[in-house]
């Protein structure tokens, strides 16, 4: 795919860390002076470049100082397999239109693997459970949370005919937090928990043969369990969970660019809210979940674009999570 003029300008500037004459840009790119001037104004407004007057000429410098991961103007976004994130479609579109980034998406099977990839700089951005991100921040300080997302779609489900007392859920995730809240509130009468890592290989093929009494899962896994005679006990949102996955960034991306990505993300969520169905087909192909289930998920998940520390404190308090103290995690939230 041919680069846009903005992308060509940014790529050219990346080769000249000390700056380049504005007059050299249109000559190098063989683009008209007026078009280059227009593009530079846009990039300057976005804070991606700075122009310094030297005599009767301008020297143009890139202000984007990021880790090696973004040198190719490519952002790597990690998500967990779910029907939760159709809103990444407008986010990806706006990252290209406004900041000149192509986006490559990697779909992970669980929260730990996806968040670990962010900490190790294998991805630059990740939509993973807030609880997982907070503990990763506590251990490494190498990520920052840029914005909210959606909540809902997950539930505690029960097989009343099961002869076991076991609970099954994903580890160190929103489901794990939901399980704990359900135990605290008396919805689950078992303390024996088993974890699955990959829902596609560990849960779906085996649920017919090993009957766990309780399973805590997200959409569309809830639909699959209903087909196998599991019933709803309580939704995770009714237990007080108001954030599932939130957007986090590696600290290899500098603060200024993180701020711009956060702003683009909020605009993307707003655009998504106006017509969620517009993005169903694209997202269905990405994650391999049928369009019908993605359409259903739109009513299952509710937007929660901004970070509300009060809601987060309330959930931690209700879950009786005191290690680490929530106050020590506030540095993870960069833009609220």
Annotate each language-model stretch with its function.
Residues 48, 136-147, 224-237:
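Ligand-binding "clamshell"
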Residues 61-63, 281-336:
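An extracytoplasmic/periplasmic, membrane-proximal ligand-sensing/linker region
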Residues 196-283:
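Pocket-lining segment of extracytoplasmic ligand-binding domains
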Residues 109-111, 121-134, 139, 199-200, ...:
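Beta->alpha turn/N-cap motifs
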Residues 76-97, 159-214, 219-223:
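Bilobed "Venus flytrap"/periplasmic-binding protein-like clamshell domains
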Residues 52-67:
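Short, Lys/Arg-rich nucleic-acid/phosphate-binding segment
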């Amino acid at each position: 795919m041919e680069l846009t003029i903005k992308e060509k300008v940014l790529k050219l500037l990346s080769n000249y860390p000390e700056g380049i004459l504005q007059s050299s840009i249109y000559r190098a790119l063989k683009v008209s002076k007026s078009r280059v001037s227009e593009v530079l104004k846009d990039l300057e407004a976005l804070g991606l470049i700075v122009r310094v007057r030297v005599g009767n000429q301008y020297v143009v410098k890139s202000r984007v100082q990021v880790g090696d991961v973004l040198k190719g103007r490519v952002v790597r976004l990690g998500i967990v397999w779910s029907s939760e994130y159709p809103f990444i479609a407008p986010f990806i579109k706006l990252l290209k239109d406004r900041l000149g980034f192509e986006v490559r998406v990697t779909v992970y099977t669980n929260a730990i693997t996806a968040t670990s990839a962010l900490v190790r700089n294998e991805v630059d951005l990740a939509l993973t459970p807030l609880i997982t991100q907070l503990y990763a921040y506590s251990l490494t300080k190498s990520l920052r949370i840029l914005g909210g997302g959606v909540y809902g779609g997950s539930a505690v489900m029960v097989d009343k005919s099961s002869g076991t007392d076991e609970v099954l859920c994903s580890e160190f995730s929103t489901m794990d937090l939901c399980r704990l809240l359900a135990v605290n509130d008396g919805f689950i009468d078992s303390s024996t928990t088993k974890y699955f890592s990959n829902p596609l290989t560990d849960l779906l093929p085996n649920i017919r043969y090993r009957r766990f009494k309780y399973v805590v899962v997200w959409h569309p896994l809830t639909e699959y369990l209903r087909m196998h005679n599991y019933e709803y006990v309580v939704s995770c949102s009714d237990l007080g969970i108001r954030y599932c996955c939130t957007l986090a960034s590696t600290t290899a991306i500098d603060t200024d660019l993180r701020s711009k990505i956060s702003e683009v993300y909020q605009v993307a969520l707003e655009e998504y809210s106006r017509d969620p169905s517009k993005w169903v087909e694209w997202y269905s192909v990405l994650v391999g979940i049928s369009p019908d289930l993605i359409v259903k998920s739109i009513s299952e998940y509710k937007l929660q674009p901004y970070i509300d520390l009060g809601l987060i404190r309330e959930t931690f308090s209700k879950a009786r999570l005191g290690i680490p103290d929530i106050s020590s995690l506030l540095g993870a939230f960069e833009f609220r």
